[in-house]
């Protein structure tokens, strides 16, 4: 039985070692989710080589010409798969009635749940599922990204089991709701801040993620900040060998 107590503000983002006992990890996750909704996981089991290869794949893709990337624009796909250029997203929702927030300074490539064109979910044109777009000049990108997607999906299943334990539920409690999840790999590039950037224009504005759980691999540049229960911003510095985990709106509700 879990008794409710008001959350208190975290002073840092905890690192949770997944090699520890499930009960101990679940207890740490419970506290982290109440205080920030964010935590790192270490000893997660994904090979460092696989993660490094995915970062290299992303760098290679974003170094393609703009014409080559625009040929894979996500708007031309039946799903949300493909390239999203700079200027299409504006995440900061603060006071939109009186303030026009600048667009985010980032470009992205989305890999959705890869289904055949004749799959029923593709036929229903649900944009979270469908045939992915891949650049012809990077033949290895598809297999590498799908391997990474499968590995991270497995880690996500482990996180869901620990979240269930943290709520005194059976470890498989979430499984019926995640038989076919929206398992998206999103590669993001944040270019250097241009000299003509608008006031308060940054890579990604303040926001919450809409899904269940986000698993984020960071490079060594940094920039991510997390707001705690008191409204203070904490720096989520890059930590080699970890993923940053955060609860999305779906799980928080």
Outline where the language-model segments fall:
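Peripheral, non-catalytic segments flanking oxidoreductase cores
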Residues: 1-253
């Amino acid at each position: 039985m879990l008794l409710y107590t008001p959350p208190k503000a975290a002073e840092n983002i905890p690192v949770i070692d997944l090699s520890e006992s499930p009960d101990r990890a679940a207890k740490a996750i419970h506290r982290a989710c109440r205080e920030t909704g964010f935590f790192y996981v270490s000893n997660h089991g994904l090979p460092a080589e696989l993660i490094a290869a995915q970062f290299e794949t992303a760098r290679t893709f974003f170094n393609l010409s703009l014409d080559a990337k625009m040929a894979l624009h996500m708007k031309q796909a039946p799903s949300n798969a493909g390239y999203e250029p700079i200027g299409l997203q504006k995440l900061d929702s603060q006071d939109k009635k009186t303030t026009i927030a600048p667009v985010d300074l980032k470009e992205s490539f989305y890999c959705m749940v890869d289904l055949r064109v004749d799959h029923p979910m593709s036929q229903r044109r649900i944009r979270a599922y469908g045939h992915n777009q891949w650049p012809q000049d990077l033949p290895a990108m598809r297999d590498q990204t799908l391997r990474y997607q499968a590995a991270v999906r497995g880690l996500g299943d482990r996180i869901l089991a620990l979240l269930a334990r943290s709520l005194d539920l059976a470890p498989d409690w979430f499984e019926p709701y995640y038989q076919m999840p929206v398992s998206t790999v999103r590669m993001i590039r944040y270019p250097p801040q241009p000299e003509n950037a608008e006031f308060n224009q940054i890579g990604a504005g303040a926001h919450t993620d809409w899904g269940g759980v986000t698993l984020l691999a960071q490079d060594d540049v940094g920039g991510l900040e997390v707001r705690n229960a008191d409204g203070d911003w904490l720096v989520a510095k890059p930590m080699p060998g970890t993923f940053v985990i955060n609860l999305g709106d779906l799980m928080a509700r």
